Amino acid sequence: MPTPKDALQDRLGYRFRRPELLDEALTHRSVTGPDNERLEFLGDGILNFVIADELYHRRPDATEGVLSRLRATLVNGRTLAEIGKGLDVGTALRLGGGEMKSGGQRRKSILADAVEALFGAIYLDGGFDPSRETILRLYRDRLASLPTEAELKDPKTRLQEHLQAGRRPLPRYEVLEVSGQSHDQTFRVACRLQDAAVTAEGEAGSRRKAEQQAAEQMLKRLEDKHER
């Protein structure tokens, strides 16, 4: 039966010649000794370049702003965490006792950091070409289904444009509830339209994100109403 690290290399499609680099990439800072933060820094730079280069050639007519937003959707922590989960990186991570007990092997930020560290480790182990090939292989499906320019806009902007197109008043956002400790708060926000008895709510760890969720829900309601 393969070890977690062997299985991870199979899923990556890359076999390390220097196993110590793989070990370092999978070592969280909660473990005493060398950790993966420097490799994460390196991998972040490589990832951003590879994705920028690929987008530049895939979208020859896109403006700099569109390319930047496309790249942001691909290299953000959420996407990296999804990739890490798909690779089952958590089973191979080295975590301190406290981090392990608190479920660190499933924490999105830790998975995202480890994926970037793996990109950096592959670059040091095999050079730029293998790191580029690995990144593009892991991003193949996402690159094949890039969002349109309209889809790149955040929900609040899309809702505003939708209402302006119909010459309707802009929405109001109201904080309904703030719960949790000061370092871990949850915001519940309502999005209300002035000319209709329609309200949508969003809930997230920041007011801004909760407003975006509420705007997204409002857009869905307006679209559903339009289709009926």
Curated annotation (Swiss-Prot):
Top-level enzyme category: hydrolase
Main location: cytoplasm
Active site: residue positions: 44, 116
GO biological process: mRNA processing; regulation of gene expression; rRNA processing; tRNA processing
Family annotation (Gene3D superfamilies): 3.30.160.20, Ribonuclease III domain (1.10.1520.10)
UniProt-annotated location(s): Cytoplasm
SUPFAM superfamilies xref list: dsRNA-binding domain-like, RNase III domain-like
Domain spans labelled RNase III: 5-127
Catalytically driven reaction(s): Endonucleolytic cleavage to 5'-phosphomonoester
Annotated CDD domains: DSRM_RNAse_III_family, RIBOc
Record's keyword terms, sorted: Cytoplasm, Endonuclease, Hydrolase, Magnesium, Metal-binding, mRNA processing, Nuclease, RNA-binding, rRNA processing, rRNA-binding, tRNA processing
Known cofactor(s): Mg(2+)
GO cellular component terms listed in the entry, alphabetical order: cytoplasm
One Pfam family from the record: dsrm
Annotated spans, Disordered: 200-228
Binding site for Mg(2+): 40, 113, 116
Biased composition (Basic and acidic residues): 218-228
Molecular function (Gene Ontology), one example: rRNA binding
EC number: 3.1.26.3
Family under the similarity heading: Belongs to the ribonuclease III family.
Main function: Digests double-stranded RNA. Involved in the processing of primary rRNA transcript to yield the immediate precursors to the large and small rRNAs (23S and 16S). Processes some mRNAs, and tRNAs when they are encoded in the rRNA operon. Processes pre-crRNA and tracrRNA of type II CRISPR loci if present in the organism.
Subunit (UniProt): Homodimer.
Protein name: Ribonuclease 3
Organism for this UniProt entry: Alkalilimnicola ehrlichii (strain ATCC BAA-1101 / DSM 17681 / MLHE-1)
Gene: rnc
